[in-house]
């Protein structure tokens, strides 16, 4: 209408050259103009409509927005929404490609099938694969990928099922992308889904040479995996092959693997199964304890030494006192004591502990192929198991008692460092130095290290232990006697004497009767070998005098080269054999003739050495007996002065706590008590005096000795007797000695010990 009026208006306003127009003429003119204007408007509207229709055919803006919605529905696995959208869209929209923001952070052309395969949308995959317009092997995008490539590299939890659906629909497992990679070459799954990776490799076929990845399976959780055959390219395209592969994958057990770094072969690494590295000593005290000195990277599992941050690290059982019992807090990872913990941390500390290592037989025996085995493979490799503790480490009381027995067999007494070093092996140190009867000075000085209290440490010593004899000692041990005897006497006289059971925690240096009573009664009565009633009663007050008298007779027979007859006034003759056997058992000596060279077996390796040592001592004794009293006069006088010294005053108070003699014991017995050989004072010197050993093996027991004045005169004057006794001018031998004679006897005895020492040093 606007055009029509615009065309008519000029007509109405046009002048007629000054001539007026009539009404009829004007009406005719208006009708013609309207018709012309209407025709022109119709033509223009038709052209506009045609242009709009043409634009509608080529316009894709609205169509792209609708296709983006299809890709979103495919990623969300919304199969129902995708079905409704495809019904409104053209049939070809299901296989069209659109822009999708992918993993590489760029827009790539992807079809709804590719997006569904990437995210594992199984319902959408089934819907799209059912449409005839969808091509399962279509390539698109700059990378030329396919739906099978997207499913293999998507890493979705259901990627295996997605690959199975595509293979069942005819997807080509050998199709390559723009880079030449097959779907099997681009498999990508999270580390926790290693079983899915194995299944994808089996479904997509083995990788070709040059594009393969190394697969390492170290251990299986349930059972050993059987090899799974992969179908060929032709069989993989068939639905039957996919169904068979699905069944095989469902039957596969879950596999738990651990990656292990591969190291090149290092010939410089020691073989932990041979030579010294497989010995018990190294395994218990050095394996995974000593730090490794290699600065380069190598296999820790093949190296016997410890490395920084290694879980197999062990604490040295010689420095850290812990037991073989596993620590319950360490298993939970909350042990706060660290290296100070008294329990084992880890498997290596538990089974390589000296108390447990190789105390049991290995179930595989000699066919065991373990790199480090904690068990013995033959009976010869079994380490001894102590009954008292139930482990390979003896109890502190058992070790202390064994030390006393061996010291008694070697002529030593417990309490000196020498006696302990002579019986303990340098390669097997004890677990608890403070609890095995050694002096405190011998323990490791580590104030921050706790003391190990093994189970059974409070138990009594084992009944199965055996006392050592001379034939059980190596020949080299006899050379130690001369070096340690002087230290032994000093320790016995000046050091603190403590009980191995811990009952006597504090003792004075001066020995008094109360200390002696506690020492002998506590140690002997608590011992299992004296646990019966008849022998336990011997230490009652009523039997004390008889026991001390018999003890003096035994010591006199050991020390004095002159056979002296004592009057058994307060000793019951029927109790002598029992007391004698008891005393011999307490000293660890089975019989007086046990250490005689004649009693040593001919097959013993120390036969000749022992015979030579005792023969030399016998020669020294003969030399001593040939000396006259005038040669020993000044020495005896000096010895008498020593007895009156303040040091000897404490010795003179051994008879009773008050210092006065007990009238139940006569003067002679009191003198013998003061001469007790177990606590004799040594005036000086470094070499030992073992003359009592020769007396023990050569002379008969005191019960069978028959001594006469003629035998005494034949021997000659003795330094053990005062001049009034040795020259026959004094009282008889059976008469009791007065105070001066007792002092002279003790002084002469000390002088003889000095002379024995001097002669022994000259002879050696």
Curated annotation (Swiss-Prot):
Any one Pfam family match given in the protein's UniProt record, by short name: zf-CCCH_AtC3H23
Gene3D superfamilies, per the entry: 3.30.1370.210, Ankyrin repeat-containing domain
Zinc finger feature spans (C3H1-type): 321-348
GO biological process: regulation of gene expression
Keyword hit for Iron-sulfur: no
Stretches the record annotates as Disordered: 616-665, 698-732
InterPro entries hit by this protein: Ankyrin_rpt, Ankyrin_rpt-contain_sf, Unkempt-like, Znf_CCCH
ANK repeat locations: 108-138, 143-175
Compositionally biased intervals (Polar residues): 705-716
Gene Ontology MF, one: DNA binding
Keywords associated with the record: ANK repeat, DNA-binding, Metal-binding, Repeat, Zinc, Zinc-finger
Biased composition (Low complexity): 640-659
Entry protein name: Zinc finger CCCH domain-containing protein 24
Biological source species: Oryza sativa subsp. japonica (Rice)
